Amino acid sequence: MTELTLQRLKASGWTPGRKVDISPIEKAYAEAGMVMPEKLREFFTEFGFLTIRYDIQHTELERHTLNPVSDFLNYSKEDFEHLFDDYEVFGTAYPVGFAYRGNMTIYYHDDGNFYIFMEPNPLYRCGKTADSLFNGLFGGDKSEWVNLDEETGLL
């Protein structure tokens, strides 16, 4: 992780080896008929329920929330099974949380990658680790991110 990523995570209450009770997240997944992948369970156990806040040039407060429970309120498993098919990313997308005051939704996918979706576009593949996801979100390093709108010609 970049130093900036670590600073922002620690300022939000994260510590290395952090473990939290993710039963509310597991319950939301179960109610939607979804089975949480083990890698995502490990991610939530360490990073779940964090809200990363920071000031951008002292004018704006950015906020990233790692709690997908509200994302399930109006959706079911079927809604997430083909979410990225237009990008030729087939399989199930699992909600992780929100970024930039809700303008972006963070997902984990069957293919082992994290993704960020912005309405109306684009979709970014953010790598297979929390490091690559967080470095791009709030650590100043998007080197592992791929804009799938550009890659697939959907822009």
Task: Give the positions of each predicted feature.
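A surface-exposed partner-binding patch
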Residues: M1-N103, D149-G153
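Generic hydrophobic/packing signal
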Residues: Y29, F49-L50, F98, F114, ...
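Short acidic-glycine loop/turn motifs at beta-strand connectors
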Residues: Y108-D111
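Short, compact, well-ordered microdomains
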Residues: Y115-E119
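Compact, glycine/acidic-enriched structural inserts
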Residues: N121-N147
